[in-house]
Amino acid sequence: MVTHAMEEPKTFNIPTFVLDENCNFIPEVLSRANAKYIKDVLIQDSYNTVCLANSFIPMTIQTAEQIMVIITKFKFSRARDLFEKVLRLGVHINRFYAGKKQVKHMITMMKSLFDTEEAMRRLDRALMGLFVDARGSSYMPLIALSLHENGLPDSKFTKAVKLINTTLNSFHNRPDADIEQYAQKLRAYNYLYKIPHYTLKEAVDVYSENLKDLSIGVNKKPTLLFTSSDDGYLSHIFNDMLFLTSTWNMIYNCKVQIRRLTTWIKYEINSIVEDCVLVGFQLPDLKDTILDLAALTSNMNLVDPDKDLFSHYKLILEKLFEISIFATKANICILPTFIKSHLIEFEDVLKRSNDDEDLNYLLLKSNDSDDEYDEDKLPIQVDPGRVDNVLTDSNFFNVTADNAFSSIAIMPISYDKIIDVEENVIQVLEVEMQSLSAVVYGAVANKYGLSLPQVIKRLNQNEGRASSRASSSHSTSTIPYSPPQSGRSTPTSILRQRAPIRSNSRSSSVSFSQDDDNRSHYSDETNISDYSYPMADLDLEDEEPMEDHPHSPQSASSNNSMSRRSRALQNEQRRRTPTMAPPSPARGQNNARLRRRTRRSTETNDERL
């Protein structure tokens, strides 16, 4: 059956794509190691679609996006959200770099058709023969002067084709049978090419080879019918003029797509930087890498848009693949939107809290009862005229060099749990996160104009009252902090400044490691009030001995054996910890009234004296 299908005649040849190990990435854009990483992560059918979208065929950005169907293998699905964005960005950068070289080659080859005086005279004679009934009009100069890379946008191309079609009745030029369907072969190697109404199948065959050579990059002058023979048939001139105008229009649209890619790529890079910052809160070991990424992105944003940005794109893409590979090997679920949801929650709590309230208590408390769900309970009624969506605030989370990784008070804690599936060999690795395991305080503080020391102070001001579940002495650590700067300075100088801030928890270093079974060991089940991930280059003062801490180096060998015991101790500790209720608003009002009365009585006594 396959043999019979192969023997059937075809109206045109479908281009074959060589699926090499580089996924059609140019070596100047992406290294072989990163290309192999893409091939290892994607399933085969998805890999083929990426190769097609990343091929030499000129196409719009929308077409490339629709062609790519990114499906990762199941074992790599945890980092899929980040990997998909990085891969799409890489394809667009590759098309940007290859497209600029492709357009330059097309222009050179098309200009070589009439690079001599004799060739220009032949073009003049052809136009005069075609427009024999309109020699006194401006048709010929308008078309001849438009045959260059900037001369035929879609509007002028449509008018030029209409002018050429007006000459169709001046000579006997009957189209060949099924010419419209046959001409579709011209789109095989170029999705931006607009097919005019050709009349000769012979011309379509010649122009198809021309477009193939132009798209692939063959150093060969295109072939025209009226220049390849001494017979100046009007039908040949008619089809050649349609090819010239449509090809120059295609080149113009290629340049338009490259300009659009520039805007698209810059937007995508700035968007992915935000996701990478959120990923960094799940993987603190990536902090320095993401700081470098933020500096590279800031440099790119400061460059004049008219300058060539490919060198910036290449460095940024290398950093993004470094982060993506690290996140894939970490084997934890990468959820930037989950981290951002806690940003929104913390912002809401920050707006509604008072200065003397414990934010940790407000964030961790639950208003839901422990009873079973009551299906008869009516939902809370909200005014239908009210529109309040924090996600519509574009300035909510704007990652800049000033607030990227300025401080982290609570870091995400993830742990592995192996679930046996019906005593089978198959095991499911489930990664869970604490109910409130990651809050980016720096970004929220930056929005409200607060300093990081003020936010940390509010988080730690009640630690003396809550010290029953922690040790009486606390360590002081120096955490990197980048205060807002005025004036213009380099991103590196902004990102590398330091200022001391008091931490609310003990710190210990955690390094990335991976066992043979590819499991993550960032932490076991740990209470977030007793442990937080540190920043790099911490200076610890009077730190308590941590031999009893489940993550200390002394107890590294006994982590697995003590996981159940630590879980039981933590549950017992939570039950014993008293609930820290926020102060009553009425009590605060009474205190305020008492202070006002005292102040008035003091002022009265002063006046009497």
Curated annotation (Swiss-Prot):
Phosphorylated. One of its GO terms (cellular component) is viral tegument. Its main location: virion. Residues 461-609 are annotated as: Disordered. It is found in: Virion tegument; Host cytoplasm. The keyword Phosphoprotein applies. Residues 465-478, 503-513, 552-563 have a biased composition (Low complexity). Residues 484-495 have a biased composition (Polar residues). Keywords: Host cytoplasm, Phosphoprotein, Virion, Virion tegument. The keyword RNA-binding does not apply. Transmembrane segments: none annotated. InterPro entries: Herpes_pp85. Belongs to the herpesviridae pp85 family. This is Phosphoprotein 85.
